[in-house]
Structures are given as C-alpha cells and as structure tokens.
Amino acid sequence: MRVYFPALSSDLGEEQISLRQAFVAVPSPDMGREDVEVLEDDAQVEAALASLILLRDAPTHAYARIVLATDIQTDSVPSGTGVLEVNNVRCDWNDVVAILADDGETSEQVRRVIEAEDQDQADHAISDLWEFPLQWFDVSERDALREILK
C-alpha cells in the first residue's frame, strides 16, 4: 500500500523514520483510474500540509515541504474510502520509493507559512506556496537533497 509520510529535513539523515501519522488513498471500488490518481495526489497534499505542521513545531529544520512516498503493509488503515490518516506507522528507507520535496527555491514561501501570525496570513501563504509543485527525487538522491536543503 502506498503510504505518504510527512517529513523534516533531519529525517533525510536518519536510518529509520520516526513513528508518526501518515496518509493513504483508499479508492472506492467504482473509481476510475483518473479518479484514483486524483485521490493519490490528495493524500500527497495532506502529507505535505502535515510536514508544514511538523516544521512549525521544529523551525530549526530546512524550510521545505517533504513527503516520503512508501510502499508498506499496514494493518492500521481505518475502514472507509478517500484520503485516510493512519497513525503509529513505522517505515525505514527500504520502504521509501520516492521523496517528494521542495528543492530549496521555495524556502521563502515555506517560511511565510511557518511564520504566519493568523489564519488569513497562513491561508494566503499556503496558496502562494501551492503554486510550486513538489519535486520528485529518487530515494538514492536523499543525501544530495539534504545538501540542497542546508
């Protein structure tokens, strides 16, 4: 199952990803391929938003949205369809199939989200940030990405 983990730049240097919430896309049986792709994108967006929350609570990390796309088996998926949150899921780098992240050029936009003083500022900053899609990195590029984000 594809599970999307929000991450911080420090996670890129760790051997194991710490236990945290993650997101999965669970399509309904009647969904077409295109609808499933939209649902997967929505799960990535939820994980990216969650990465901003992690960053807000730990602002010494690089200002970047980071999502780890993993293929893992988990029994903790709640019943239902749509984008679902799963908790207390553990994975390691062998499970990661891709890293979705800002490439460092959006650090100012991410900083504006993190430092927003009210909901209106945050909403505007997030809207501006979402003009920049996450970049796809192969898991073998994790050290290079860590250097980019320093």
Model-derived features: positions:
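Arginine residue identity/basic-tract feature
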Residues: 2, 20, 33, 56, ...
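Charged/polar, solvent-exposed surface patches and flexible loops
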Residues: 10, 14, 49, 53, ...
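Positively charged, polar, low-complexity stretches
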Residues: 19-76
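Short, extreme N-terminal segment that most often corresponds to the first beta-strand
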Residues: 1-27
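Glycine-rich, aromatic-bearing surface loops/beta-hairpins
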Residues: 70-150
